Design a protein with these regions (language model features):
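Canonical positions in the second alpha-helix
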Residues: 31-32, 65-66, 99-100, 134-135
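Alpha-helical segment of the N-proximal tetratricopeptide repeat
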Residues: 5-35, 45, 51-52
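Canonical tetratricopeptide repeat
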Residues: 45, 79, 113-114
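Register position in tetratricopeptide repeats
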Residues: 18-19, 52, 86-87, 120-121
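Single-residue signature of alpha-solenoid repeat helices
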Residues: 25, 59, 93, 127-128
Length: 137
């Protein structure tokens, strides 16, 4: 796929995304080799499209490409943690959670991620409540 074709497809895909036509946008996204794309924002948008369609593994894979290009991004790490849980990979979610708390030790979103992990692990409700109470502080 040449640059012109890539540009046309991505513009059309983003227009469909803005209109809320995520299924059609995902069909266009499937035609592009995202490993060659360096634009982090584009990769995050594609990940959003796949996530809205319930294609969590594709969303996770594309977001992982963005992570490799911008390793210090709290937003990407947070979303990777959530997507890892949605794909049933709790161990990876814990790894991303640890990365997130190292990068942003004072970010209150860490408590939401902790709660999501505890919930996925079916931890006692007291522990889950404790994580949410920490967020509330």
């Amino acid at each position: 796929m040449d640059k012109y074709e890539y540009k046309l497809k991505t513009e059309q895909m983003l227009e469909l995304m803005e209109e809320g036509s995520y299924r059609k946008a995902a069909e266009l996204a499937d035609e592009i080799d995202w490993r060659k794309v360096r634009n982090i924002t584009m990769l995050m948008n594609v990940s959003d499209i796949y996530e809205k369609n319930g294609e969590y593994q594709k969303s996770y894979d594309v977001l992982n490409l963005a992570y490799r290009r911008a390793e210090g991004s709290r937003k990407i790490i947070s979303r990777l943690c959530t997507l890892a849980l949605k794909t049933g990979n709790v161990d990876e979610a814990i790894d991303y959670y640890d990365d997130f708390t190292q990068i942003a030790p004072k970010d209150p979103n860490q408590y939401i991620l902790r709660y999501q992990i505890l919930r996925a692990q079916r931890a006692p409700i007291e522990q889950q409540i404790e994580a949410l109470e920490e967020y509330k502080k």
